[in-house]
Amino acid sequence: VLAVLLLQKEAGIQHPLRVVPLFETLKDLDGAATTMNTLFNMHWYKQHIQGKHEVMIGYSDSAKDAGFMSASWAQYRAQEELTAIARKHGVQLTLFHGRGGSISRGGAPTQQALFSQPPGSISGAIRVTEQGEMIRFKFGLEGIAMQNLEIYTAATLEATLLPPPEPKAEWRELMNRMTDHSVKVYRQTVRENPHFVKYLRTVTPELELQMLPLGSRPAKRKVSGGIESLRAIPWVFAWTQIRLMLPAWLGTGAAINEVIADQQKATLDEMLQQWPYFQTLIDMLEMVLSKADANIALYYESHLTEDEDLKVLGNQLRQRLKDAVETLLALKDESKLLSDNEVLDQSMQVRKPYLLPLHLLQAELMKRRRDYLAERQAEHTPVDHALMVSIAGIAAGLRNTG
């Protein structure tokens, strides 16, 4: 923050741009309040901001680093702490949410997302990003655009005037316990399994996504490297294409299951009924699980690899997906996903028959492209365009893809 202010001063900028710090990784989110407190304690900085400050909360890298549940809880706590620090220093804080379309990147229905923020964190103003794949759906037509702007305005006013209740101490304690277990399970698979990166690059179109003319940044931060080098959008996009949806549920289902097994379902039920944050978290998890399909993921795997180590890992991931679905149904006392959201359920049932042939076609195109490149030195293949069309078609059908 100070370096950017100094740069503008040295460059002789007469009307300096405001500097908005971004807190995104798990470590940065945990230290956000301390960082801002240090800045606010500087007398000249307090004078410079004139009682107003904007802070950006990032969603992508924290979810890729620690999993959906752990990242979500870290973002919630960071907002609470930032709000308290700003209030202590008499600063009007505006939180800038760098959300994406997928739940791993903070995606959720606008009204639900705003109501699930910590009490007091929305004080008459909010700033959000709308990702590329969502802009056309939300603002492509004048009437729909007006409706979405009205939703933003109404939700901001309601969250300001009628903030949600403070979470109880026992709810916080349970969330801390679940997120600790969630991040452990998530990292055991993503970071510690020696076959995970190879599985990602063999079974999903992670490498092929680099062909797509999408986004403002490259798919990777570095040409080579592991999960750390991959940007958050293609990370989510790749798993979505094969319908495994791994970033959203890995670790989360196991954490909830552990609490239920420990005879604490009554507390979870209370959280689900009385705490908007937890309601939204579970609703978004259910929505993503309803879009997952282990059989489609298995088809990609059987079509693209004969490696026994990868097949073992694939079986483990599909079993964990099944366990996550069963855990969610047990938590909500339901027999099927989306039983309390018939509109979304019907929407998915209508789209699924159109998605299936795209998945079958895509897996075959991926195999043909890789076989073609293995036999000759080339950058492009005859199936590149068809493969890109299949990727775009699946993304359009599933909506919140990256």
Regions found by a protein language model. Name each.
Residues 1-2, 29-31, 104-107, 347-355:
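Short, solvent-exposed polar/charged micro-motifs at secondary-structure junctions
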